[in-house]
Amino acid sequence: MNTWITAKIIKIKKWKNNLFSVIVNAPISPFTAGQFTKLGYQKKNGKIIQRAYSFVNAPHEKNLEFYMVLIKNGQLTTKLYNLNNTDHIQIKKKSYGFFTLNEIPTCKILWMFATGTGIGPYLSMLKYQKNTEKFQKIVLIHAVRYRHDLTYFNEINNLKNIYNKKLYTQFIISREKTNFSLSGRIPQLLKTEELEKHINLFIENNTSHVMLCGNPDMVKQTQNFLINNKNMKKHLRRKPGQISSENYW
């Protein structure tokens, strides 16, 4: 049975555009980078409001970090957003999910596509580093609406330095232009080949594995493009393929 345990709020980091990070400390069971858990807030009537969130922190780090967006009239996010370091919430003892690097076959290039808060699992994986040796190159792509939505911009650049030339990073911003990002949306930039040409690496079914995390529309459209245009298949334990995905709502 997966029980609820108490987590102490360490810090609520409030970013721009209603984005925030919840940092807690709790004696959870060991988890695998890329997994998610459930956070809960207990109401006065004893009922727990709960939602699933992926870990941003690596498994070896002391505190647990979760990245989310404040939802207007959202039952849980409005509670979490207004907590401070004297408060406590509930967290599941054990974690969930198979969106992890140990589930990905060895290949030449691993592509990590994320929109918005879907960047979280990749940060956990890359900080932990375990199983990254299975790939010659890793490409991390983070797509957002505005530059202020790139909450972990500095952390991503630090990871790029740690991995040296093994990690490629690319930011995509859809609603404003910058001198460091591509403009548009992931599916369209794949269709035009602008993304691959800009990075100078190419998605091929015999060399690449693609991970998709975030907006369900992005996941669906990108997955369909890869299946129809790159001759790729969904990756299943019983039937290996080249596409792994996780929807974020």
UniProtKB/Swiss-Prot annotation:
One of its GO terms (cellular component) is cytoplasm. Disulfide bonds: none annotated. NADP(+) binds at residues 144-145, 174-175, 185, 215-217. It catalyses: 2 reduced [2Fe-2S]-[ferredoxin] + NADP(+) + H(+) = 2 oxidized [2Fe-2S]-[ferredoxin] + NADPH; reduced [flavodoxin] + NADP(+) = oxidized [flavodoxin] + NADPH + 2 H(+). Keywords: Cytoplasm, FAD, Flavoprotein, NADP, Nucleotide-binding, Oxidoreductase. It is an enzyme of class 1 (oxidoreductase). Its cofactor is FAD. Residues 2-102 form the FAD-binding FR-type domain. Belongs to the ferredoxin--NADP reductase type 1 family. This is Flavodoxin/ferredoxin--NADP reductase. It comes from Buchnera aphidicola subsp. Baizongia pistaciae (strain Bp). The lineage of its organism: Bacteria, Pseudomonadati, Pseudomonadota, Gammaproteobacteria, Enterobacterales. The gene is fpr.
